[in-house]
């Protein structure tokens, strides 16, 4: 198996080659969402544009009841998106590559770097064991887009995680990722710290009571009545 060198200068050159966010994802201050009549889902930190036959699952921390990530599914493919704090002017790309290569290697997995639609793309195959003790493999492709003090991560899984490029099973999820808008709050954050999302009112009514309570407290609203 080829040993991947995350510090190979070609990856830094690739990341600095162009503005990989020219066609999105966008910062909130870069767009005028009132200029069109598109229906969007506002998760506070992240604003999404839904698409036909989109399925959505929220990943919630059991202890804090904070929404950490969103899993968007289309057919046999899925895209997990999450937002993190980032420096105002320094790229995190090199550190991310280094950390992900190290972690994947420690897990006995295979990791490859390649040119993707947002600079360096990280492709991983990680061995896992199911309940019967059988070895299975988690295959994924990871995208990163960095904006003003934020970093957006997208992890492609399923059919989209096993293909290359942005056509075929990746096409719809690629367009979804490009259409994302990040609204970074003013709170000071250590680079790499997760920035939680808030659930839109139209979806919150369907959530469990404890999640509704936690979301109300996070937004400084009165506790939900029993």
Where are the language model's segments positioned?
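Short glycine/proline-enriched loop/turn "hinge" motifs that connect secondary-structure elements
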Residues: 71-73, 143-150
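Short acidic/polar mixed-charge low-complexity motifs
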Residues: 75-78, 134-136, 150
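Long amphipathic alpha-helical segments with strong coiled-coil/leucine-zipper propensity
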Residues: 59, 81-83, 92, 100, ...
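N-terminal targeting sequences that direct proteins away from the cytosol to non-cytosolic compartments
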Residues: 1-69, 134, 159-226
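A short acidic-to-branched-hydrophobic micro-motif
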Residues: 69-94
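Short, well-ordered beta-strand elements
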Residues: 81-83, 151-162
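Signature of long, low-cysteine stretches enriched in small and polar/charged residues
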Residues: 100-146
